[in-house]
Amino acid sequence: MSRQKALIVDDEPDIRELLEITLGRMKLDTRSARNVKEARELLAREPFDLCLTDMRLPDGSGLDLVQYIQQRHPQTPVAMITAYGSLDTAIQALKAGAFDFLTKPVDLGRLRELVATALRLRNPEAEEAPVDNRLLGESPPMRALRNQIGKLARSQAPVYISGESGSGKELVARLIHEQGPRIERPFVPVNCGAIPSELMESEFFGHKKGSFTGAIEDKQGLFQAASGGTLFLDEVADLPMAMQVKLLRAIQEKAVRAVGGQQEVAVDVRILCATHKDLAAEVGAGRFRQDLYYRLNVIELRVPPLRERREDIPLLAERILKRLAGDTGLPAARLTGDAQEKLKNYRFPGNVRELENMLERAYTLCEDDQIQPHDLRLADAPGASQEGAASLSEIDNLEDYLEDIERKLIMQALEETRWNRTAAAQRLGLTFRSMRYRLKKLGID
């Protein structure tokens, strides 16, 4: 079996020699170029499994080489080597299609990790990625989404996944991880809005025994738990400002220090994040740091809401009903034609999650394994009317009407946060005490 090959592009002989020796010890063959012209000539003569290029070259920019390789040799991952502190340059490289980046002086441990990760990438021309049956839909937006997931899986760039609640952002993050070179390492999801602010630093970075009351033993943080894999920051907009500063530093330095610890520990983690909020608007309102926003939003991936892919609803409904039948051991129910039309005309503010909840209820209520329009109870759902408000003639009692709206909104927040009451209260802009009072008043357990 022939050895894998790496192309090294740098005009400094000392750097070239260091990279050649390190990669040679990893059992890689290397070819070296001093500039863009020589690199192109080598690429035209033979294939490479990896390219390491300096940002500044005598006859051009490393960015030009990244773009050239992306167009002519997309199967070859490229890592950019930049000067220390040149984060803007590194982000430019990632946006251009670079797999990852290193800063000078080159950390050899980090270099070896990067090379090992790059070599685990699947060649897109050698095999086609299997279609994952968890991300259903044949509509143009879903086909485009699956294509983007495949491309982003080959990169180590941070990805900001935007989309409405219930649209499947965590599933998309999980697929990016599973289709990439980190698949054998952990995927660690965390709901940023569900962690109490006083415990946040300990949760993310870990703590040492005795560092605070209740710290009876050393604890590993989320960054270390995700080492070598992916850390998914869900509802990242809910992070308090003080934590945003610490998160930014951890991402930039690729190192964390436990609460009560004296030394930083290097971490190799890919960062994916998501929120149902408009993160750019949060920056404009002063609730989210602009520097962290630019660090997280190297590439944005939008997950379409269900109303933008209505043609996928019958397929989704069929799969959900089959799963419900399998879970209960009962025959699968079928949507009538009228019920399908009702679903396709409904706005689904809660997206796929709302569809799942709606069909689970209808499956329980239907007769003869036939789901009729009335089983869906769309008239009671939040998206049944675009105006969302009843006329005066429909309201018998204002207090009962307002209480019903309050109950629906609280239930929706609880479902979207998987019944985490603290997170649901934050989403509704309530204190936990106020949330607890309303739950008791409305009889919600």
From Swiss-Prot:
Keywords: Activator, ATP-binding, Cytoplasm, DNA-binding, Nucleotide-binding, Phosphoprotein, Transcription, Transcription regulation, Two-component regulatory system. Residues 5-119 form the Response regulatory domain. Phosphorylated by PilS. The modification 4-aspartylphosphate is found at residues 11, 54. GO terms for cellular component: cytoplasm; protein-DNA complex. CDD domains: AAA, REC_PilR. It is found in: Cytoplasm. The keyword Cytoplasm applies. Changing residue 269 to L: In strain: PAK. GO terms for molecular function: ATP binding; ATP hydrolysis activity; cis-regulatory region sequence-specific DNA binding; DNA-binding transcription activator activity. Residues 418-437 bind DNA. One of its GO terms (biological process) is regulation of cell projection assembly. Pfam families: HTH_8, Response_reg, Sigma54_activat. The keyword Transcription regulation applies. ATP binds at residues 163-170, 226-235. Residues 135-364 form the Sigma-54 factor interaction domain. Disruption phenotype: Deletion mutant results in changes in swimming, swarming and/or twitching motility associated with virulence in specific hosts. Member of the two-component regulatory system PilS/PilR that regulates the expression of multiple genes including the type IV pilus (T4P) major subunit PilA. Thereby, plays a major role in the regulation of multiple motility pathways. Upon appropriate environmental signals, the histidine kinase PilS transfers the phosphoryl group onto PilR. In turn, PilR functions as a transcriptional activator by direct binding to a cis-acting sequence upstream of the pilin gene promoter leading to its activation. This is Response regulator protein PilR. It comes from Pseudomonas aeruginosa (strain ATCC 15692 / DSM 22644 / CIP 104116 / JCM 14847 / LMG 12228 / 1C / PRS 101 / PAO1).
